[in-house]
């Protein structure tokens, strides 16, 4: 992705959060220059990858395949004694016409909540023991206290306020229901590790390579400078 695309996506996500009164923590507003002076008191932000996260999944067409996210809180699976939180929270922004590709998580379970805007469609499949997609078996779905069964590949429609529970090894993808508008989502989960806990099918990247065509508006969660001693 070009840095200009990343900056544009960040501003759009920021505006969507403001529109739906989802106020962000202070570290989301630090400029790149301000990050240069942040000491070890912000190690949790660095080590747990809190903050902004823009991806095109390495496909080079963000408006068709992409997602904009903010990790607001998180623990660490590898540094549990230092960061003992067992939960994470994100905000996610999906534009109409965008698609977030099919994947599951080995470790975390999560609730995906429609926080406002249009309707999101989440397609679900079970997985086989070899981690391939099960295109045949029915899927047990949990939405807002309701448990029911749907055929493989069904898209679960979430209107604002509705949510779905995604268990481990459940393949799922995201798109916006056409004509309903961009969507702001929430995610509540176990600890999040996007470097090691995404099984995409077909395989693809999670974090984009960035072409620096302008200065960054905000740093992404993978870009923080080391703390000054």
Residue ranges and their predicted role:
Residues 129-148, 175-229:
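Double-stranded beta-helix
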Residues 1-87, 216-223:
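A short, N-terminal "cap"/entry segment at the start of jelly-roll beta-barrel domains
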Residues 77-88, 99-111, 115-116:
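A short beta-loop-beta micro-motif enriched in histidine and acidic residues
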Residues 102, 123, 174-175, 196:
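Short helix/loop capping segments that flank catalytic or ligand/cofactor-binding pockets
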Residues 90, 110-111, 154, 162:
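Short, conserved secondary-structure segments in the cores of folded domains
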Residues 95, 152-179, 185-190:
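Conserved metal-binding segment of the jelly-roll/cupin
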Residues 95-96, 108-110, 114-130, 134-135, ...:
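Glycine- and acidic-residue-biased ligand/ion/polar-headgroup-sensing regions
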């Amino acid at each position: 992705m070009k840095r200009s695309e990343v900056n544009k996506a960040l501003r759009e996500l920021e505006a969507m959060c403001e529109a739906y009164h989802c106020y962000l923590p202070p570290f989301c507003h630090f400029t790149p220059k301000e990050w240069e002076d942040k000491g070890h008191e912000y190690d949790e932000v660095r080590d747990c990858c809190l903050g902004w996260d823009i991806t095109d999944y390495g496909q080079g067409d963000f408006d068709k395949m992409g997602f904009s996210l903010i990790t607001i809180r998180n623990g660490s699976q590898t540094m549990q004694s230092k960061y003992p939180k067992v939960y994470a929270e994100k905000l996610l922004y999906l534009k109409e016409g965008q698609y977030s590709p099919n994947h599951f998580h080995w470790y975390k379970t999560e609730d995906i909540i429609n926080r406002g805007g249009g309707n999101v469609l989440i397609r679900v499949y079970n997985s086989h023991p070899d981690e391939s997609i099960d295109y045949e078996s029915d899927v047990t779905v949990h939405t807002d206290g309701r448990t029911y069964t749907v055929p493989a590949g069904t898209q679960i429609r979430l209107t604002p306020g509705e949510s779905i529970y995604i268990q481990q090894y459940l393949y799922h993808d995201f798109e916006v229901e056409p004509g309903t508008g961009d969507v702001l989502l929430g995610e509540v989960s176990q600890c999040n590790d996007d470097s090691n806990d995404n099984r995409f099918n077909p395989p693809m990247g999670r974090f984009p390579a960035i072409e620096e065509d302008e200065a960054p508006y905000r740093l992404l969660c993978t870009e923080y400078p080391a703390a000054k001693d």
